[in-house]
Amino acid sequence: MNEKEKIMKKTILYYLLPFAFYLMPFLGYAQSFQWIKDGGSAENLGSNDYEQVYSIATDSQKNVYVLSKVGMSNLNVDGNPKTNYDNPSSFPTDIVLASFSCDGTYRWSKIIGGSGTENISSVQVDSQDNVYVAGRIASCDNGSVSQPYPGRIENDYTFSNASNACSLIFLAKFDTNGVFQYIKRPQLPTTSSNAITYTASFNFQIQDDILYWFVWLPPGTYADGAFTNSTSETHAPYVLKYNLDGSFIEATQLGNIQGIFSIIVNYYRNPNNGFYYMTFAKTSSTTFTINGQPVVNAAALVCYDNNGNLLWKRENTQAMAGSLVIYSLDFDPQNNIYIGGKIAGAAIDSFMGFTASFSSPAFVMKLDATADNLLWASHHSTVATSGYGALVYNGNEIAFTGWCAGTNFTWGTQSIYVTATNEGQDVLLARFDSTTGSCLSLHNITSTVGSTDRGTAITVDASGDYLVGGGFAALIYDTNGNSVTNEGGTTDFFIAKFATEPCSPLSNETFETNTIKVYPNPARNVLTVAINENTNYELYTITGQLVKQGKLTTIDNTIAVQDLSKGYYLLRIGNENGNWQSIKVLKE
């Protein structure tokens, strides 16, 4: 070993040994549910809605942000009273955006509400830890005596609308402390029919600090005249792109859709190749076509290239509504596609050649980049966990959350005792090898007898720990014996951390001196190094292997990392005088 290699080994040990805790998930140390927080009201929501987390985001400091529908009576978040702004006479339902710190301490929350049921699709965080939500308020109420429940974001913003001049979709930004920054409403005031019937908001993502917002829009002019939808259809799918400051970049149309239909739709962008994906599931036997191609069966996965051109469509084989539901998608650097969902049992349905032998089990699946080949798929082998779920890719593994029950809940080679027979269900966290699909472990959140609980959202924080969110019916416990209790109604929402300790040390601290700053960290595709002089760089694995090196200037100051395996790296930056500084970075 030469002298430079010896120095690098010492440097890597110096920087990484103090952070051994955040490497524990990769070294086999036991993880468990370290803390649980909750919120909700004391009533049921209407139309089969539930108080349950459906979107989670985390930032560089491992603060947590969640979205959930909430009711009115005794509404609170972790004991902090909140106000519902809906009409109290008919199943009042609003949305809460809530934030908790790394150790679960309550930080702040916002109620987004008004008359009707809002659709706020997801919460996202940028590289500077600002927080964004996008979605649609429910009505054109103007705040008058006869329409006293206008859309609003607490006391930050009230939507000005009227039945003949209505605009419902919006994008809002807050800083990390919940301070309102701006709102964007790309649709010009239009008729209530256009705003309510033909305008929809779906998923919303931030990748490399660009905002991608998936919407359906009727013909008209949008984004202060920046683009026009001139389709002859009643509405067309678009992805709207924005900079972090709210300036509009462009709109890309994702083909055409025809028909008014009852379907569950979501959109995703693969950050590695820039392609767009749509999942849908019919809820009734309705007519639905994509680019003039009829959708015959109950569900499908659809792919568009980065210009919005339809590439392919993969359907299931059963026309019965609800026979296949896709909960979520994720992607790896090779553009393989991971799917979590449920499928009808008794082999009456098939998707990509995959079938199930018993009633509607949850499944996880891996397809190649073009969805021509099923690489692996599996479902649990005992009845449970249909109806709800979510999936996330985490390097060498896939994590899935849903629900489980019974004395011997089994998935692959793994089994756990959950509950006695017919004594309720618990939240499930299942982990799988992303290469082989083998089940690595099963975990449940302990609850009182008879409780009906489920996981409905999952993400990974900067330490590689999992955040699991969902709904619970009675009382649930973390591994330290702390519990949260349902206020009343069918469910309250919860957020829980699965880790080796309540707040693992940061694995993605942004290194900053007077001259250097690295962002985003963690990164998927590109690391940007903010410097004021020319420098050299070297990028090492945690075992000391040099994987990249080169020069950076104040103009050309980015490092491509999209081809690297997910995990932790040591970035060394050296100036022309030979002074070197080392920075920990995380590749997502």
Residue ranges and their predicted role:
Residues K4, L16-A30, K173, G220, ...:
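Low-complexity, intrinsically disordered/propeptide-like segments
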Residues P18, D129, N335, E397, ...:
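Short, intrinsically disordered/low-complexity patches at protein termini
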Residues Y29-E509:
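A sequence-level/structural motif corresponding to short, flexible coil/turn segments enriched
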Residues F511-Y519, A523-E588:
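C-terminal outer-membrane/trafficking sorting elements
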